[in-house]
């Protein structure tokens, strides 16, 4: 795969994939960006916005009318003003990156005619109203809230619509399946319709008490006869001399067992004897023979049900009602009345059951009014119903668009499931919908149709940022609506403006609450670029409106066939959240309805085309899909006749003829997530280990020197670019200026006359991430380099030449070593520590605030009482630590003093004060000190002052530096602008006839470059030429130049003004100082490391280089792993990676030899030939010139990087071939010598290069020791945990252990003086000071707590101070 990019030419990856990628992988953070853009619609023209997102929210809440309908507030449009601070300023100041929302509202006041009640418009007022700030998304798909980056995780929830299910036979002891249907709206009441054990159908609203479903139908306006005719067909039985004549229908009589002989009504012949079962085939044959009607006797009619009321036509008397069962008695009465024909319900108890008829019979409500009252009583128990209120309440439950919303998705799903065709704009329920649901449910009970699978991805959808935010903002607006209505009614509506009616606080508060405290708004995992990207692609089933951990069963957490290509089956957390938190697959995207789609190539008549189609899980159910690795001939036809496919309908893997295949996967890696796609040889790892591997890559700490893996998968570049860690060029151009903090590129394409022709890229230097890892970007380009749009120009944390680089390639030997790698321990060589291979920088942030207290303001100063000059050596005159100072635990970072309260003085003190004057100080030292366990260098200090507080020297110095930086940016941009503009102007004026010019220019002479050089550039604009077109062009250029210049100056002044303005600090805070300490962490025993295959371990020992096992050429292994960690874990991928890494390093050595040869003989031919052998016919390598070739060879010297994509990577033969090319043993094993004795080991050992990561579980963050520290207030026991500087818990089991050993005194000491015997603690201290080693244990404070607890229960407990068993004991009080 040729990568013709700037960095791609510097280091070429050999690609092992065989399958051509047809579809472009979508941008990896598209989910977040697209969703939020759709919500805000900033880019859309204000008038032409679609009814979705923010627009839809306003449209749904407005217009708002007052209670008397005399005025109305209408929504016109909204727009955003530019944000007050940009992203970086928000991060530094602890602000939220947000834009003010301006909404135009129109207030219409009506005149109401008292007689007719007609309204006429009296007055219209329009006004812009500020509606709070809406947080904006940064370029990388995050939000900056109160200065920290947060991510809004997408939520998976049950799609709105209708679902059919049964209880799996659990409810009733007989194991009978009870079917149920549930209509779930997007918002509004749930409607459940369910069977009970007696086959009566009930309805429940919002899980309240159940009602017979016929009551619901009565409330919908049907009567008994209509209900029966909706659910059952009618059959007319005609009276003849011989009996009853019934029309014969094969479908109806199939499966029917006869009790009497079946007789043809026309011929009188017996067609079927008694006791026989009528099969489907036999029934069809009878119909074909011309059987039209059967003869039935009276006893055949008994037990059937009437379809219509039987009325005496003369008197109007009702003999029997519709739905009544015919008994022998009632049949006799009917015969006496002389009815010639009866209309009965077609219920045969086999194919059609009498459930609705039985429900109707059991229902005590017979009219619409009764039914409405009943529903009202269920929904609002205790309130007396009136017909009006009951009607309104029922109407508002399902049919009012303000209260009930199915959403477009819900309507689409409902139409599909019930085979209806309502438009997706109709978002409330209809009568037809409810009847269709009941019909389908009864059909299920009769054995027709299938229940739904709620874990099918067609029944679960994704709510992304935009939608979550939309719901939240709607809640805020609805809260506001109530207030507006009340205000409209209470003020004089003729004199007010819209501004006076609106209080935007509730809307702003809803947004703030959502970003600050919602379960889905999470502190971004910023350990490395991969963890950022994964966090943004996460799908959570938890959160508001979702599941809870405790309630979620196995089914929800399981992998489902529809996850293929949509949700990764591998990446999910271990522990209680397993399966509830998932990750999007690499190629997946979310469609407009919120369903996850995956791309497929269309197959036409057995030929695979390059047309890519995205299918959701519902659509895929209709097709057969072939795998990406099916063999194709050069024309794209299938080689095999039978193809292995996934059949969407049965969800099974089947063999299908080639011409029946509909689609084919676009790529083998489309079924896994980004993190899993970064694991080479994933196909050779057990799934459990792959899960750990993909999770642990997210915990890899960025190292000081990033190094891309020798054995990659080809995804590394994609992740680095899309995560925003590496910087890509926005436009094609030439590098103009460069230093460590910024890159200036002069654009040569995409030039827009209204915009600057210069792109300035600011690099982040030693910034702290959310996880305290270090974010540092380094430029990759030199001045004069040509870069194309999209080329990587700077590396970020954990990236190397634009590729993700989470760890380092180290030389590994798989062998036991003195038990030091027992149980997954890891043995390391001292070289790793010495060469800083696994060294990382962590930046800790400490802040201190000077507040205004009741006793006076706190002060940040160098003048601290009772502190030696030695302790202040790192502070400047303002009392703040210098940048670059080395600090360790306990050092002062910022000196601060707090006024102390005056304590009442004793007469003696008063006398002394009178004699000796003022007391030394009434302030105490509250300085910010370095906490225990931290040691490092100060890299940055930020000082924030409240507006109106004088800035100290340090704050002014920081401000001056910042202004200089801004001025330099402005001057550089100005210089490039001048160069561009005057260069173009000189080109335009060159060799033109001059008719005017600056002072001293002779008229009608030629303007040449030499003439121009004589005048300052600012006077060039005075030259004039007779060519009008030329002059117009120059005039336009000048206008644009002046505008650009003015814009630059204005931007600079704005930024300076922001700097000099005071900061917005929390109330009561006068000044705040933030100090950043960079801590260098070398790897040490106790740190956790891991490979990419779930092979994790803890460093047990660091061994001197000379003691490590070494190879024949004297190279020492860097790391020794236990071979027993492989077989039982079944992650063989690490072994294949080791072999391939060994080959890569071997090839790198060979390239190194060709470099040496070039320096000796100046001949590049051997180098080109070696590279051709390795890479084959790679276009990139052919196109390189000599200088580029040498640079490439230098970069390949440590090892040749290769890409082996998941499920389509290097096979065993490829690995052997690579080893052969490198001149190494094809077994991948080498003779290894013991570093301590120099003897060779008996067996050959697998040696190679493996990519190891250092994980963010560092022993320095965990180790902790306490002597005396804080105690809990109530129990007086030490606190626990490192954060509280707590002690170690001596728990119940530890007490048992000491009891078992009979260590009575040790135990007593643990439970008293070392814990919560307050008096005893001080006595022990005094005894130790005296040099005495005896002590006496008193009563633990927790005993007193117990006594108090018992007293609170009303039990008076006293401790008597008697001599107990000869030991003195003090009274409790």
Curated annotation (Swiss-Prot):
What InterPro entries would the database entry show?
DNA-dir_RNA_pol_bsu_ext_1_sf (IPR042107), DNA-dir_RNA_pol_bsu_external_1 (IPR019462), DNA-dir_RNA_pol_su2 (IPR015712), DNA-dir_RNAP_su2_dom (IPR007120), DNA-dir_RNAP_su2_hyb_sf (IPR037033), RNA_pol_bsu_bac (IPR010243), RNA_pol_bsu_CS (IPR007121), RNA_pol_bsu_protrusion (IPR007644)
| Disulphide-bridged cysteine pairs | none
What keywords tag this UniProt record?
A: DNA-directed RNA polymerase, Nucleotidyltransferase, Transcription, Transferase
A Gene Ontology cellular-component term:
DNA-directed RNA polymerase complex
* GO BP terms: DNA-templated transcription
Give the EC number(s) listed in the UniProt record: 2.7.7.6
Catalysed reactions, as listed in the record: RNA(n) + a ribonucleoside 5'-triphosphate = RNA(n+1) + diphosphate
As one GO molecular function, the record gives: DNA binding
The record's annotation in SUPFAM superfamilies points to: beta and beta-prime subunits of DNA dependent RNA-polymerase
Q: Does the keyword Nucleotidyltransferase apply?
A: yes
Family assignment? Answer: Belongs to the RNA polymerase beta chain family.
According to the record's subunit comment, the protein's assembly and interactions are: The RNAP catalytic core consists of 2 alpha, 1 beta, 1 beta' and 1 omega subunit. When a sigma factor is associated with the core the holoenzyme is formed, which can initiate transcription.
Q: What does this protein do?
A: DNA-dependent RNA polymerase catalyzes the transcription of DNA into RNA using the four ribonucleoside triphosphates as substrates.
Record-linked HAMAP family: RNApol_bact_RpoB
What is the name of the protein in this document?
DNA-directed RNA polymerase subunit beta
**Organism (species):** Rhodopseudomonas palustris (strain BisA53)
Q: Which gene encodes it?
A: rpoB
């Amino acid at each position: 795969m040729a990568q013709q990019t700037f960095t791609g030419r510097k280091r070429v990856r050999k690609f092992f994939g065989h399958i051509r990628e047809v579809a472009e992988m979508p941008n990896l953070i598209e989910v977040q960006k697209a969703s939020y853009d759709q919500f805000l619609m900033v880019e859309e023209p204000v008038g032409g916005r679609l009814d979705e997102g923010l627009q839809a929210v306003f449209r749904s809440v407005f217009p708002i009318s007052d209670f008397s309908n005399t005025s109305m507030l209408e929504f016109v449009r909204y727009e955003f003003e530019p944000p007050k601070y940009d992203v970086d300023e928000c991060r530094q100041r602890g602000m939220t990156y947000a834009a003010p929302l301006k909404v135009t509202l129109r207030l219409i006041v009506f005149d109401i005619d008292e007689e007719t009640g007609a309204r006429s418009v009296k007055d219209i007022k329009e006004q812009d109203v500020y509606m709070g700030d809406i947080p904006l998304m940064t370029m990388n798909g995050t939000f900056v809230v109160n200065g920290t980056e947060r991510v809004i995780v997408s939520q998976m929830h049950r799609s709105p619509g209708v679902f059919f299910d049964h209880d799996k036979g659990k409810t009733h002891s007989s194991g009978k399946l009870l079917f149920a249907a549930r209509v779930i709206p997007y918002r509004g009441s749930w409607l459940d319709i369910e069977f009970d054990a007696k086959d009566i159908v009930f309805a429940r609203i919002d899980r309240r008490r159940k009602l017979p479903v016929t009551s619901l139908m009565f409330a919908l306006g049907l009567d008994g006869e209509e209900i029966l005719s909706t659910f059952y067909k009618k059959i007319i039985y005609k009276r003849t001399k011989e009996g009853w004549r019934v029309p014969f229908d094969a479908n109806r009589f199939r499966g029917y067992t006869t009790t009497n002989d079946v007789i043809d009504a026309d011929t009188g012949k017996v067609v079927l004897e008694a006791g026989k079962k009528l099969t489907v085939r036999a029934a069809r044959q009878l119909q074909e023979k011309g059987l039209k009607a059967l003869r039935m006797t009276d006893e055949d009619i008994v037990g059937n049900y009437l379809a219509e009321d039987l009325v005496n036509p003369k008197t109007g008397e009702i003999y029997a009602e519709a739905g009544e069962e015919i008994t022998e008695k009632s049949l006799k009465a009917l015969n006496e009345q002389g009815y010639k024909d009866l209309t009965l319900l077609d219920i045969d108890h086999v194919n059609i059951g009498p459930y609705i008829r039985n429900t109707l019979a059991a229902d005590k409500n017979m009219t619409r009014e009764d039914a409405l009252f009943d529903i009202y009583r269920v929904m609002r128990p205790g309130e007396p119903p009136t017909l009006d209120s009951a009607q309104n309440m029922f109407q508002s439950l399902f049919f009012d668009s303000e209260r009930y919303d199915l959403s477009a998705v819900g309507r689409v799903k409902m139409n599909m499931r019930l085979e209806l065709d309502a438009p997706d704009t109709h978002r409330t329920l209809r009568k037809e919908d409810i009847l269709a649901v009941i019909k389908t449910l009864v059909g299920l009970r009769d054995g027709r149709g299938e229940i739904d699978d709620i874990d099918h991805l067609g029944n679960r959808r994704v709510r992304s940022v935009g939608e979550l935010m939309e719901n939240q903002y709607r809640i805020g607006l609805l809260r506001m609506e109530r207030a507006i209505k009340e205000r409209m009614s209470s003020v004089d509506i003729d004199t007010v403006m819209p501004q006076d009616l609106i209080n935007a606080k509730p809307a702003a508060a809803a947004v703030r609450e959502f970003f600050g405290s919602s379960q889905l708004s999470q502190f971004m995992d910023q350990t490395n670029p991969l963890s950022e990207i994964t966090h943004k692609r996460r799908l959570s089933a938890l959160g508001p409106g979702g599941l809870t951990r405790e309630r979620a069963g196995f089914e929800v957490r399981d992998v489902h066939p529809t996850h293929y290509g949509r949700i990764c089956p591998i990446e999910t957390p271990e522990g209680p959240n397993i399966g509830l938190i998932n990750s999007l697959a690499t190629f997946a995207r979310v469609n407009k309805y919120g369903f996850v789609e995956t791309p497929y190539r269309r197959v036409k008549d057995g030929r695979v085309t390059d047309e890519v189609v995205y299918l959701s899980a519902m659509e895929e159910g209709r097709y057969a899909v072939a795998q990406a690795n099916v063999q194709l001939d050069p024309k794209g036809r299938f080689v095999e006749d039978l193809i292995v496919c996934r059949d969407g309908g049965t969800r099974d893997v089947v063999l299908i003829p080639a011409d029946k295949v509909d689609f084919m996967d676009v790529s083998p890696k489309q079924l896994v997530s980004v993190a899993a796609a970064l694991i080479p040889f994933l196909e050779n790892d057990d799934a459990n280990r792959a899960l750990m591997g993909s999770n642990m890559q997210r915990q890899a700490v960025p190292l000081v020197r990033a190094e891309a893996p020798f054995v990659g998968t080809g995804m590394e570049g994609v992740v680095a670019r899309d995560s925003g860690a590496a910087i890509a060029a926005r436009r094609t151009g030439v590098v103009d200026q460069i230093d460590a903090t910024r890159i200036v590129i002069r654009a040569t394409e995409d030039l827009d006359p209204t915009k600057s022709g210069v792109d300035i890229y600011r690099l982040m230097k030693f910034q702290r991430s959310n996880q305290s890892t270090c974010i540092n970007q380094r430029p990759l380009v030199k001045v004069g380099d040509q870069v194309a749009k999209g080329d990587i120009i700077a590396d970020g944390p954990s990236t190397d030449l634009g590729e993700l680089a989470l760890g380092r390639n180290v030389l590994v030997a798989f062998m036991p070593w003195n038990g030091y790698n027992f149980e997954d321990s890891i043995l390391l060589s001292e070289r790793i520590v010495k060469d800083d291979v696994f060294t990382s920088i962590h930046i800790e942030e400490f802040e201190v605030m000077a507040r205004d207290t009741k006793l006076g303001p706190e002060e940040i100063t160098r003048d601290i009482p009772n502190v030696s000059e030695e302790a202040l050596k790192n502070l400047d005159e303002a009392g703040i630590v210098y940048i670059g100072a080395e600090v360790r635990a306990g050092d002062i970072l910022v000196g601060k003093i707090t006024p102390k309260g005056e304590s009442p003085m004793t007469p003696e003190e008063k006398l002394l004060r009178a004699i000796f004057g003022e007391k030394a100080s009434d302030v105490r030292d509250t300085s910010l000190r370095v906490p225990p366990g931290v040691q490092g260098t100060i890299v940055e200090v930020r000082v924030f002052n409240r507006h109106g507080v004088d800035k100290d020297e340090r704050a002014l110095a920081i401000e001056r530096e910042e202004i200089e930086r801004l001025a330099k940016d402005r001057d550089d941009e100005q210089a490039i602008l001048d160069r561009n503009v005057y260069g173009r102007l000189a080109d335009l004026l060159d060799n033109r006839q001059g008719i005017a010019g600056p002072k001293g220019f002779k008229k009608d002479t030629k303007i040449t470059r030499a003439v121009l050089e004589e005048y300052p550039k600012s006077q060039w604009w005075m030259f004039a030429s007779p060519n009008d077109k030329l002059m117009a062009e120059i005039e336009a250029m000048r206008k644009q130049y002046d505008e650009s210049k003015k814009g630059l100056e204005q931007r600079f002044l704005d930024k300076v003004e922001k700097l000099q303005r005071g900061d917005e600090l929390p109330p009561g805070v006068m000044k705040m100082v933030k100090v950043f300490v960079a801590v260098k962490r070398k790897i040490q025993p106790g740190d956790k490391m891991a490979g990419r295959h779930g092979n994790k371990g803890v460093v047990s020992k660091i061994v001197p280089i000379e003691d490590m096992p070494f190879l024949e050429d004297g190279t020492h292994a860097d790391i020794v792993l236990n071979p027993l960690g492989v077989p039982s874990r079944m992650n063989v991928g690490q072994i294949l990676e080791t072999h391939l890494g060994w080959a890569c390093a071997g090839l790198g050595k060979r390239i190194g030899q060709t470099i040496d040869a070039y320096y000796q003989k100046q001949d590049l031919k051997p180098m080109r030939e070696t590279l051709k052998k390795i890479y084959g016919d790679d276009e990139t390598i052919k196109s390189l010139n000599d200088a580029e070739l040498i640079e490439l060879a230098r970069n390949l010297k440590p090892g040749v990087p290769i890409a082996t994509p998941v499920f389509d990577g290097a096979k065993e033969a490829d690995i052997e071939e690579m080893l052969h090319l490198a001149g190494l043993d094809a077994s991948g094993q080498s003779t290894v010598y013991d570093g301590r004795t120099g003897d060779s080991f008996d067996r050959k050992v697998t040696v190679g290069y493996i990519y190891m990561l250092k994980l963010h579980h560092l022993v320095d963050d965990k180790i902790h020791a306490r002597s005396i520290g804080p105690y809990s207030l109530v129990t007086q026991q030490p606190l626990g945990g490192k954060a509280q500087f707590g002690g170690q818990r001596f728990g119940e089991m530890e007490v048992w252990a000491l009891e078992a050993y009979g260590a009575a005194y040790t135990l007593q000491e643990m439970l008293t003086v070392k814990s919560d015997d307050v008096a005893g603690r001080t006595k022990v201290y005094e005894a130790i000071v005296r040099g005495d080693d005896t002590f006496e244990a008193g009563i633990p404070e927790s005993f007193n707590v117990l006594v108090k607890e018992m007293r609170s229960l009303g039990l008076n407990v006293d401790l008597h101070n008697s001599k107990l068993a000869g030991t003195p004991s003090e009274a409790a009080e």
